[in-house]
């Protein structure tokens, strides 16, 4: 199946906004086994939009239009598609009720006739409810070509796609099942090298590597009759892949940390803290609270995290954490001594089960004769205080801080698994 994405909005063409919807939709279509062959952007102009729809209908099986569903006169997507399909626009009862409920809570005068446009759908289409906005989407098939209209705001589009469109397309078209494996501690080029025979000779299942900042994912996909068969095929391939070793001789299983497109090292670590009923604190220097803010972003974070420290200067490290200033000056802030002292003092001061620390050189300049990207991460438990040195080279200051935070989460994750004898 060939799909085409059409982004509608003059603001995209003028560079006022970035078309992040195209990337999101392309990923979702890939998960469903639907190939996106074309991406088009067109302004808020009926004639040009008609031309784009006509072209898409001649070369694609699935045409997805994003944007132009709002209440203003330049929101023309549904109206133009209806004109092309020679269909009427009708009102969706559920969308009308949502409009009524929305404006019932506001001044009656704030509701104008053009608001009603958001509740319209193309006659004969399947409405796609909008959980986070007012403009209803839709799905319709005419003469063997399927058309989808989606709202432009990314928060509305993502919700509609995940909750409405993906289940609908899954029933109609797809028998593709996927599993995403996540790795930290190995680069994409090395991963592709050690798995080159699998990747070069792949048929079904397929293997698709993706590089992200600081980590790599592998998407394993298979077309089969049901989930049980897919699980068997993907599970067998996964076992074969994880049995391979990196160029340094480390099993890939050691750098594999979890599953899922939307998963993360931070989430895995947070869930382990909750599972094993452990509390954590952090003392941060170069990351300036990034570890703590990431951890606090998860609902229920207060179960495992009560607070921590951000101490940038040597003097603040001494004052906030009670570390001897002369010893700090002797060893330097970019050192194992400082990292271990920060982690242990943070743990003792808060009473947490685990203390973690990050200190180092974010860059771009050297510090204490250490190059940019040099990071020491400390970790303290009741039984042990340790640290690791990480060199994050060739990265921006922002990425050094982000990747350092990933290393800290990974260190905590591995410690938790060791405590439970799972690693």
Curated annotation (Swiss-Prot):
SUPFAM superfamilies: CinA-like, Molybdenum cofactor biosynthesis proteins. It comes from the Bacteria. Signal peptide: none annotated. InterPro entries: CinA, CinA-like_C, CinA_C, CinA_KH, Competence-induced_CinA, MoaB/Mog-like_dom_sf, MoaB/Mog_dom. Belongs to the CinA family. PANTHER family: NICOTINAMIDE-NUCLEOTIDE AMIDOHYDROLASE PNCC, NMN AMIDOHYDROLASE-LIKE PROTEIN YFAY. This is Putative competence-damage inducible protein. It comes from Streptococcus pyogenes serotype M5 (strain Manfredo). The gene is cinA.
